[in-house]
Amino acid sequence: MARFSRLEVLNAIVETGLVPVFYNSDVEVAKKIAEAVAAGGARVLEFTNRGDFAPFVFTELARHLAQSNPNIILGVGSIVDAPTAALYIASSANFVVGPNLNPEVARL
Protein backbone atom coordinates (compact mmCIF):
# COMPACT_ATOMS: atom_id res chain seq x y z
CA MET A 1 0.00 0.00 0.00
CA ALA A 2 1.30 3.45 -0.92
CA ARG A 3 2.41 5.73 1.90
CA PHE A 4 1.93 8.93 -0.13
CA SER A 5 -1.10 10.30 -1.95
CA ARG A 6 -1.06 11.05 -5.67
CA LEU A 7 -0.97 14.76 -4.89
CA GLU A 8 1.98 14.36 -2.51
CA VAL A 9 3.89 12.44 -5.20
CA LEU A 10 3.15 15.06 -7.85
CA ASN A 11 4.09 17.95 -5.56
CA ALA A 12 7.38 16.29 -4.60
CA ILE A 13 8.26 15.75 -8.27
CA VAL A 14 7.48 19.38 -9.11
CA GLU A 15 9.38 20.71 -6.08
CA THR A 16 12.47 18.58 -6.72
CA GLY A 17 12.45 18.96 -10.49
CA LEU A 18 13.82 15.50 -11.20
CA VAL A 19 13.17 11.81 -10.63
CA PRO A 20 16.30 9.66 -10.47
CA VAL A 21 15.76 6.30 -12.18
CA PHE A 22 17.78 3.19 -11.36
CA TYR A 23 17.93 -0.59 -11.09
CA ASN A 24 20.36 -2.88 -9.36
CA SER A 25 19.86 -6.58 -8.73
CA ASP A 26 21.72 -6.46 -5.40
CA VAL A 27 19.51 -5.36 -2.50
CA GLU A 28 22.38 -3.87 -0.52
CA VAL A 29 23.65 -1.87 -3.50
CA ALA A 30 20.09 -0.66 -4.23
CA LYS A 31 19.80 0.55 -0.62
CA LYS A 32 23.08 2.45 -0.91
CA ILE A 33 21.99 4.03 -4.20
CA ALA A 34 18.69 5.15 -2.67
CA GLU A 35 20.41 6.60 0.39
CA ALA A 36 22.94 8.45 -1.78
CA VAL A 37 20.19 9.91 -3.95
CA ALA A 38 18.31 11.02 -0.83
CA ALA A 39 21.48 12.58 0.60
CA GLY A 40 21.80 14.48 -2.67
CA GLY A 41 18.40 16.08 -2.14
CA ALA A 42 16.09 14.00 -4.32
CA ARG A 43 12.86 13.03 -2.63
CA VAL A 44 11.33 10.88 -5.38
CA LEU A 45 12.99 7.73 -6.70
CA GLU A 46 11.97 5.39 -9.53
CA PHE A 47 13.14 1.77 -9.40
CA THR A 48 12.93 0.16 -12.83
CA ASN A 49 11.44 -3.29 -13.33
CA ARG A 50 14.31 -4.73 -15.34
CA GLY A 51 15.71 -7.89 -13.77
CA ASP A 52 14.50 -11.31 -12.75
CA PHE A 53 14.53 -10.40 -9.06
CA ALA A 54 13.36 -6.80 -9.43
CA PRO A 55 10.12 -7.30 -7.43
CA PHE A 56 12.07 -8.84 -4.54
CA VAL A 57 14.68 -6.07 -4.56
CA PHE A 58 11.93 -3.43 -4.71
CA THR A 59 10.08 -4.93 -1.73
CA GLU A 60 13.23 -5.00 0.38
CA LEU A 61 14.14 -1.48 -0.71
CA ALA A 62 10.66 -0.18 0.15
CA ARG A 63 10.89 -1.74 3.63
CA HIS A 64 14.32 -0.26 4.16
CA LEU A 65 13.33 3.25 3.09
CA ALA A 66 10.17 3.18 5.22
CA GLN A 67 12.42 2.73 8.25
CA SER A 68 15.60 4.62 7.35
CA ASN A 69 14.28 7.50 5.26
CA PRO A 70 10.47 7.69 5.39
CA ASN A 71 10.32 10.95 3.41
CA ILE A 72 11.58 9.26 0.23
CA ILE A 73 8.82 8.50 -2.26
CA LEU A 74 9.61 5.23 -4.02
CA GLY A 75 7.88 4.23 -7.22
CA VAL A 76 8.42 1.78 -10.03
CA GLY A 77 8.98 2.15 -13.77
CA SER A 78 9.07 0.04 -16.93
CA ILE A 79 5.67 -1.45 -16.11
CA VAL A 80 3.72 -2.70 -19.14
CA ASP A 81 0.83 -4.71 -17.67
CA ALA A 82 -1.70 -4.59 -14.85
CA PRO A 83 -0.59 -7.75 -12.99
CA THR A 84 2.95 -6.41 -12.67
CA ALA A 85 1.65 -3.01 -11.58
CA ALA A 86 -0.55 -4.68 -8.96
CA LEU A 87 2.43 -6.66 -7.66
CA TYR A 88 4.45 -3.48 -7.11
CA ILE A 89 1.50 -1.56 -5.67
CA ALA A 90 1.07 -4.37 -3.13
CA SER A 91 4.78 -3.95 -2.36
CA SER A 92 4.33 -0.25 -1.49
CA ALA A 93 4.97 1.48 -4.82
CA ASN A 94 3.81 5.08 -4.52
CA PHE A 95 3.62 5.54 -8.28
CA VAL A 96 3.80 3.39 -11.41
CA VAL A 97 5.35 4.48 -14.71
CA GLY A 98 5.31 2.65 -18.02
CA PRO A 99 6.74 3.12 -21.49
CA ASN A 100 3.24 3.19 -22.94
CA LEU A 101 -0.27 4.10 -21.81
CA ASN A 102 -2.00 0.92 -20.74
CA PRO A 103 -5.61 1.57 -19.67
CA GLU A 104 -5.56 -1.50 -17.40
CA VAL A 105 -2.55 -0.16 -15.51
CA ALA A 106 -4.10 3.31 -15.30
CA ARG A 107 -7.22 1.89 -13.63
CA LEU A 108 -5.15 0.59 -10.72
Predicted features and spans:
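Conserved N-terminal beta1-alpha1 strand-loop-helix module at the mouth
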Residues: 1-83, 87-91
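Hydrophobic, well-structured mid-protein blocks that either form specific transmembrane helices
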Residues: 83-108
